[in-house]
UniProtKB/Swiss-Prot annotation:
An example molecular function term from Gene Ontology annotations: blue light photoreceptor activity
Record's cofactor remark: Binds 2 FMN per subunit.
Cellular component aspect of the GO annotation: cytoplasm; nucleus; plasma membrane
EC numbers, comma separated: 2.7.11.1
Bias kind Low complexity: ranges: 40-51
Domain text: The PAS (PER-ARNT-SIM) domains are required for the binding of FMN chromophores.
Superkingdom, taxonomy of origin: Eukaryota
Keywords: ATP-binding, Chromophore, Flavoprotein, FMN, Kinase, Nucleotide-binding, Photoreceptor protein, Receptor, Repeat, Sensory transduction, Serine/threonine-protein kinase, Transferase
Gene name of the record: PHOT1B
Gly residues bias locations: 1-11
Protein name, entry field: Phototropin-1B
Top-tier EC class: transferase
Maturation and modification: Autophosphorylated in response to blue light irradiation.
Organism name: Oryza sativa subsp. japonica
Sites of S-4a-FMN cysteine modification: 173, 450
């Protein structure tokens, strides 16, 4: 990390002397790293090379001393200290490193050096023990010192940089800088440190041997209860393998990025969340040791793929204090290995997808995850509520929607996508598996033609077949010898397949590689051909979710400029009449037609505002999203899908889209304003943070009806939670936020119950059942942490059954005040979702029917989950919903609550800014 400083005192004199000795005027190291921060106390923290050597111990053998120095350095890299006999110089074993993390050598016998070492801030023994649990790459620095010296460095930091503990502790992290380090990023770091704020960025650093590497640096401040700055934690992740590097600024002729996926923003999102695990240890070292899971070691993962994201909450209410029982924060750059080793051995393949890019691959639900529970799960448990934490960031992180990977990124196969519309048909996407196979970094291959895999023994006739297929826009499957970056050759069963757009024109080429050690014979080749062709088809379907990279930037948002036409049930409302009046005047609805009233919430891509249509008295909610952020966060296709979905909706429990338009910088959606706010806030306002069963039944029933309608339209919602359930003035619900939803086609079915024929069934009240569900499964890693279904985490592909899982979580939260699987960290939450049995606390009385419903909805196998066979009909028929008049549910009066939705004053005030909703249903 870096800091501001002024040059003075003996530090400035020493720097001048060093400049004279090195023969140049500006302070640079061997790599050309500038001392841009001008520390005032640099002399206090000399490197190992500059430190004076003390006399050798009596009778010490010189050669043995050299060996001991090497051993000391290796021990320091593991956080240990080599103990030697001061008379013989013989190693006597190792011991734990002092709390500062600094290994002592015989040179510390020098009194002057002892005094200097004593001035170095050191972490406490308790904190050192807590931090030693983590094997990630990070440092802790002293924020009370102007130079921010390092107090502690993890073993991962030594392994990544090549430096030893003696060379690191007490120094500022600027020694990692070099000639290629971007000074603008350094300025950002300095500003963050000066302000005591967070920083996350990718910078080019240098190892001790001069090797450059891309370092994803995340800095977070540690403050005491009074807000005083104490420490900084700096977490490093080497992302050289996966980042675009300097290619992130390369654009096509149309101005869009050359790469199909923007990795930089995604990596930063992951890292911001990951550092929260270390923050928890620094703020409360005992929290880890006191945890029942304190024996679980965090494993280091030096790739982008294992980190997690932090994005501000979508709605303003999320910044509030919500339930005291909410858990704290820890998210690490690691695979989900936060379960006992015994479980890990049996679950390894099932978690492989999550280990790749937080689930970026195809995994399966393991048998032991689906096995029946030994004890009766419906018996009330005496388990305590999850631990409460005061971490504001963690509270927000748990409740916000996350978008960790597209379906394309989760395909764990060796493949690339090229664009023939660009010169030389360059690579615009490469899978992580392809990078591992070929040993190249992503930065090295983006924008290049695939010919770099060829070598001396590559058959030229086979290469011509591939070129002819490209020229003819046809498929081809061949075997040829290719070479990795290190020169290792391998037989490649290569399949080339064109990907066409809706007009039939070739959009991309998909190249799938099936590697082998030798030439594959005919029978085996046929099996391989089937496999690579199937993979190519999956890639084709997944890539179609993303916008065409050859579109002009303005064309990406063209759908948002289309005029919105009223759907049948809402066209005669006062709101629609006001909108239509503007359109009839010949004007297009735009930002100029609305007056901002107040902000309603904000998120990582934009904000929501209450606005008034000028001179009408009609109020709406306007969602404004920043175009540049949408591009950088790979959310263009999400915004496009949300606009398409809103255009389809015509239901009382779902929002109405009145208009959409774009400005130079934003896209805007105009929908209903719900003065009742979020169900989340309503829950929070209740004395015990829970609702009684009648209220839960009412809200859950309306959610079921809304989800049933969405599924009939081919929409998988994927983000059900109290924050996304808004309340109208009449107390009825409206689901909102469809930016994580999936739109596909629908397959309607009508069938009779199996236990009766048509006549007998009608006499018994068993009428034909209408059932419709989205046809195409998805594999995106999206949702909200506590509500995500197991199949999303494992990467096994998911259907509309994920919405029924989320309904089970919603029921639990409304009844008990918290979600059943939440953990201190995101990884712990995900591990709980995959492994932990659901418990029903005895402290709150909940009916057997309610517990049965939650138990059946929270079945880890989606095929056996309630709602997977007959959809919403199965859920509607559950005993918990007995007494609900489904056809007339809109006429049902909302239940009375301990704290009502509106007070009398609220009714008077909010009634002035409420749409007049005519009941057309």
């Amino acid at each position: 990390m870096a800091s501001k400083g002024t040059e003075g005192g003996h530090g400035g004199v020493e720097r001048k002397e060093q400049q004279q000795q090195r023969g140049y005027q500006l302070p640079r190291d061997s790599r050309g790293s500038l001392e841009v921060f001008n520390p005032s106390s640099a002399s206090s923290f000399r490197t190992a090379a500059a430190a004076p050597k003390s006399a050798s111990p009596f009778l010490a053998i010189p050669d043995r001393e050299e060996d001991n120095v090497v051993a000391q350095q290796r021990a320091a890299e593991w956080g240990l200290v080599l103990q030697t006999d001061h008379h013989t110089g013989l190693p006597q074993g190792v011991s734990a490193r002092p709390s500062s993390g600094s290994a002592r050598t015989s040179s510390e016998d020098n009194p002057q050096q002892q005094q200097s070492a004593a001035a170095i801030p050191r972490v406490s023994e308790e904190l050192r023990a807590a931090l030693s649990v983590f094997q990630q790459t990070f440092v802790v620095s002293d924020a009370t010192h102007p130079n921010h010296p390092i107090m502690y460095a993890s073993a991962g930091f030594f392994n990544m940089t090549g430096y030893t503990s003696k060379e690191v502790v007490g120094r500022n992290c600027r020694f990692l800088q070099g000639s290629g380090t971007d000074p603008h990023e350094i300025d950002k770091i300095r500003q963050s440190l000066a302000n005591g704020s967070n920083y996350c960025g990718r910078i080019l650093n240098y190892k001790k041997d001069g090797t450059p590497f891309w370092n994803l640096l995340t800095i977070a401040p540690i403050k005491d209860e009074d807000g005083r700055l104490l420490k900084f934690i700096g977490m490093q992740v080497e992302v050289s393998k996966y980042t675009e590097g300097k290619k992130d600024t390369v654009v096509r002729p149309n101005g869009l990025s050359e790469s199909l996926i923007k990795y930089d923003a995604r990596q930063k999102d992951h890292a911001r969340s990951s550092v929260s695990e270390l923050l928890l240890a620094l703020k409360n070292p005992r929290s880890l040791s006191e945890s029942s899971n304190n024996t679980l070691k965090r494993k280091s993962q030096e790739s982008l793929s294992m980190s997690m994201s932090e994005v501000p909450s979508k709605r303003s209410s999320e910044s509030g204090s919500r339930r005291n029982s909410r858990s704290g924060t820890r998210s690490s750059l690691q695979k989900i290995n936060e379960v006992p080793d015994q479980v890990n051995r049996t679950r390894k393949s099932g978690l492989r997808a999550f280990m790749g890019f937080l689930g970026m691959g195809h995994g399966s639900v393991e048998k032991n995850m689906l096995k029946p529970r030994d004890e009766d799960p419906l018996i009330d448990s005496d388990d305590e509520r999850p631990e409460s934490f005061e971490d504001e960031f963690r509270r927000k992180e748990m409740r916000r929607g996350i978008d960790l990977a597209t379906t394309l990124e989760r395909i764990e196969k060796n493949f690339v996508i090229t664009d023939p519309r660009l010169p030389d048909n360059p690579i615009i996407f490469a899978s992580d598996s392809f990078l591992q196979l070929t040993e190249y970094n992503r930065e090295e291959i983006l924008g290049r033609n695939c010919r770099f895999l060829q070598g001396p023994e590559t058959d030229r006739a086979t290469v011509r077949k591939i070129r002819d297929a490209i020229d003819n826009q046809a498929e081809v499957t061949v075997q040829l010898i290719n070479y990795t970056k290190s020169g290792k050759k391998f037989w490649n069963l290569f399949h080339l397949q064109p990907m066409r757009d809706q007009k039939g024109d070739v959009q991309y080429f998909i190249g799938v590689q099936l590697d082998g050690t030798e030439h594959v014979q005919d029978d085996a080749a046929k099996e391989g051909v089937v496999l690579v062709k199937k993979t190519a088809d999956n890639i084709d379907e997944a890539a179609k979710e993303l916008p065409d990279a050859n579109l002009r930037p303005k064309d990406l948002w063209a759908n948002h400029s289309k005029v919105v036409l009223p759907n049948p049930h809402m066209k005669d409302t006062a709101s629609w009449r006001a909108i239509q009046k503007v359109l009839e005047s010949g004007e297009s609805i735009g930002l100029k037609h609305f007056r901002p009233v107040k902000p309603l919430g904000s998120g990582d891509t934009g904000s929501v505002h209450l606005v008034e249509l000028l001179n009408t008295g009609e109020y709406f909610a306007m969602k404004a999203m920043d175009k540049s952020i949408m591009l950088n966060r790979n959310k263009v296709h999400r915004a496009t899908a949300e606009r398409q979905i809103l255009d389809l909706l015509d239901h009382p429990f779902l929002p109405t889209l009145y208009a959409s338009f774009q400005t130079k910088t934003h896209i805007c959606l105009i929908t209903d304003y719900c003065p009742g706010g979020e169900l989340f806030v309503l829950l929070d306002n209740q004395p015990l943070k829970v609702l009684h069963e009648d209220a839960v039944r009412f809200y859950a029933a309306e959610v079921v009806v809304a989800l049933e309608y969405l599924h009939c339209q081919g929409i998988i919602y994927r983000d059900l939670k109290p924050e996304n359930i808004l309340l109208h003035r009449d107390g009825h619900i409206s689901l909102t936020d469809f930016d994580l939803s999936c739109l596909t086609s629908c397959r309607p079915q009508v069938f009779l119950p199996e236990d009766a024929d048509e006549k007998k069934g009608r006499k018994n009240g068993s009428y034909p059942i209408f059932f419709a569900e989205p046809m195409r499964a998805s594999n995106s890693f999206v949702g909200t942490e506590e509500y995500i279904a197991p199949e999303i985490i494992t990467g096994a592909g998911h259907t509309s059954a994920v919405d029924w899982w989320a309904l089970g979580i919603l029921l639990y939260e409304m009844l008990y005040g918290y979600t059943p699987f939440r953990g201190k960290t995101r990884q712990r939450t995900f591990a709980n979702i995959l492994h932990k049995d659901i418990r029903f606390p005895a402290s709150i009385s909940v009916s057997l029917a309610a517990r049965q419903l939650m138990y059946r909805l929270l079945h880890r196998d989606p095929a056996n989950r309630l709602g997977s066979y007959e959809g919403a009909n199965e859920i509607k028929g559950h005993p918990f919903f007995r007494g609900i008049n489904w056809p007339l549910i809109r006429a049902t009066a909302p239940p009375k609550l301990e704290i009502p939705l509106f007070s009398k004053d609220d009714m008077e005030k909010k009634g002035l800014v409420t749409n007049n909703r005519t009941d057309m249903f």
